[in-house]
Amino acid sequence: MHVDTLWSNVHLITLDGEGLGVIRDGVLACADGRIVHVGPAGSDANLRPTTRIDGEGRWMSPGLIDCHTHLVYAGNRANEFEQRLQGISYAEIARAGGGIVSTVRATRAATPEQLASESRPRLLAMRAEGVTTLEIKSGYGLTLPDERKQLQVARALGEGCRVNVVTTFLGAHAIPPGREAQEYTDEVCNVMIPAIAAEGLAEAVDVFCENIAFSPAQARQVFEAARAHGLAIKIHAEQLSNQHGAELAASFGALSADHIEHLDDAGIAAMAAAGTVAVLLPGAFYFTRDTTLPPIAALRAAGVPLALATDSNPGTSPLTSPLLAMNMGATLFRLTVDECIAGFTREAARALGRGDRIGRLAIGMDCDLAIWDIDAPADLVYRIGFNPLHARVVRGQPDLPASWSNT
């Protein structure tokens, strides 16, 4: 069988099945951007590759997937970081006109070119750590033209940087200054969601359901509008208090419920029944100096899938390192190495509704890969402040190091 590229002499972290699915001394082949063979050394005898690459004993995993980011924005909120160091809470900052709305002002004022220029370095930092797929939310415009601008810039950045960008509409992120909450919710549902769906600018709709943002009733209204327009559902839930948002989202078959530090047993049961992924965001937990841990043990016991993400945003998680987020997941949330790696691959893909396309090394999946100079998979989680990425591959096309050649 002819194949485009065959990698040999690599240790595979397949994530196919339980655990990491490691195949030592493996081979992987792709054709037309998809994986067509995965197996141990010697299983490739009938393959005729155009390009053969010796992995030289490195490790290969699916390309990393960051399933929760707010990467496209303008401005800087270092001043709020200083305020929090002085003991002022995130909620107090938000109520005083800071927080999300301060980024809204800067993002509205930025041209698309300025927005792309400020956001590109953040995307490149993630790409440099093996990210091949990245979710980017809107939510810093809070008007239809400005939300549209964010989503368009996100899509363009992905195309220009060879990263698969999945866009999520988060118009229900904050109440704009001078607006009444219900009036604005009606606009999100009756004006913004129909337009965003018609223009094909987003795959999902998200809501920040919290006592400083949108009520459960308003979140329900947004979910109903999303469902009516064929968009998937996600939620920022139970970050600061238990609003029962995760349970609500699960009743709509949500892809994921994110943050969930204050999640209760009813929410866990609802997520388990619906197959809703728990997206854990240790960067925000760390940066806001939170002390309430997500109910990890109960989520495990219920069989809720656990994904990890950076939550990259200017206010509560200015983090662009998936590798550091993995370490935080282990040290702060007591996740295992397997859970951390799966959380940025297989389970992150599920949180984006793409579990049948990315996140595993298996026949038929997109050939999105990360190749690492490590001794064992645990090195991806254990070490801090280093980047062992050797190469990325997106749909079968490598970012070729100089040492690779066609042989």
From Swiss-Prot:
- Give the matching InterPro entries: Amidohydro-rel, HutI, Metal-dep_hydrolase_composite, Metal_Hydrolase
Q: Name one Pfam family in it.
A: Amidohydro_1
Q: Which amino acids does the record list as binding Fe(3+)?
A: 68, 70, 236, 311
Pathway annotation from the record: Amino-acid degradation; L-histidine degradation into L-glutamate; N-formimidoyl-L-glutamate from L-histidine: step 3/3
Q: Report the subcellular localization.
A: Cytoplasm
Catalytic class of the enzyme: hydrolase
Query: What cofactor does this protein call for?
Result: Zn(2+); Fe(3+)
Residues that, per the record, bind N-formimidoyl-L-glutamate: 140, 313, 315
Task: For this UniProt record, give its keywords in alphabetical order, as a comma-separated list.
Answer: Cytoplasm, Histidine metabolism, Hydrolase, Iron, Metal-binding, Zinc
Q: Does the keyword Ribosomal protein apply?
A: no
Q: Where does 4-imidazolone-5-propanoate bind?
A: 77, 140, 173, 239, 316
- Note the HAMAP family from the entry: HutI
Q: What is the documented function of this protein?
A: Catalyzes the hydrolytic cleavage of the carbon-nitrogen bond in imidazolone-5-propanoate to yield N-formimidoyl-L-glutamate. It is the third step in the universal histidine degradation pathway.
Q: What is the recorded name of this protein?
A: Imidazolonepropionase
Native source species: Stenotrophomonas maltophilia (strain R551-3)
Q: Which gene encodes it?
A: hutI
